[in-house]
C-alpha cells in the first residue's frame, strides 16, 4: 500500500506533533510535581544514578557477576528508590507511571512503523484521514456526496434514442456496479472500470464516491487528470534539474503504486507518441501488478480504439468493464 508523498508527509507530521504534545504535557506535569514535592526530583536523579552505575560497571572491562555484591547493592538501592517514588506519587494523587514516557500507540511507540518495518495501524489511520481530506478538497465534495445520498431521480425516466434503457435505469445499473466495486474493494469481481459518456452526467460525482469509500477502508487512492499524468511522465523523462527530477519520480511512482488509480478526463490531452507510450506503461503496469484502475472519459470504447494504439485499446477493451453514461447534461437541466 503506497500513499501519495504529500499524504504521507502530512500524516507523519501529525504523528510528530502528537509525540511533541505528549512530551510537553509530561514535562509540565513533572515540573509541577517536582515543585510540590522536591524529594521526588532527588529520587528521580538517584534512580538515574543507579542506571549510570550499572552502565559504568558493564563498561569497566572486568567481568561482573549478575548476582555479585556490586550489582546486588545497586539493585537494592534502585528498588528502595522505586518504592519511595511510588509512595511520593501516590501522595500527590498519581500512579507510579504518571511521569513515564508512555506512547499513545504501544505497537510502534508513536513512530508509525513497527519493529519489523511494517506501517503501523495508527499511521495508516492518519494517512486515510489525510487522503480523504485531500480528495474532498480536490473534488469539492460535501458530506452528502456519497453512495448513501446519491439520487437517481435527477435522471430522465423516458426512453433515450438508440438505447434500450432510460437514463435513470442505466444509471441504476451503473451505480450498482460502482457501489459494489467501492464497498467490496479490492475483492469485487470487476477490477477495472471505464466510465464513458458526455459531460455533466455524473462520472466525476461517482468517481468521487468511489474514491471516498475506498479511502475510508484504508486503501491508497490517487485521483488525477490524464493531462497531469502525462505532464509528470514528460518531466521525469526530459528534466535536467535534480529537484524537479525527484519530484517527477514521486509523481510517476504514485500513479503506478497506489491501490486505486482514478484517471479523469482521458482524451483531453494531445495524442503524442509519448502520451501513447505513457498511457500504455501505466495501464499495462497496473494490470500486471494486479492494481485497480478507473478511467473516466468522454470517449466511447470505439473512439478509444481509433485514437490510441491497438495494444492499449486491446488492454482497455478486454480487461476493463465499460459503464456508459447518457442522458441530458444535469448541469443544464437543474440550473
Enumerate the predicted regions with their spans.
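Walker A/P-loop nucleotide-binding motif
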Residues: 190-206
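P-loop NTPase Walker A phosphate-binding motif
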Residues: 205-218
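Short, charge/polar-rich alpha-helical segments
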Residues: 1-13, 18-48
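Loop/turn-to-beta-strand initiation segments
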Residues: 191, 219-220, 257-260, 289-295
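Interdomain "pre-motor" coupling segment immediately N-terminal to P-loop NTPase/helicase cores
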Residues: 93-145
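Pre-Walker A (pre-P-loop) alpha-helix and adjacent loop at the N terminus of AAA/AAA+ ATPase modules
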Residues: 143, 147-193
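Short glycine-rich substrate-engagement loop in P-loop NTPases that contacts/grips substrate
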Residues: 159-174, 215-257
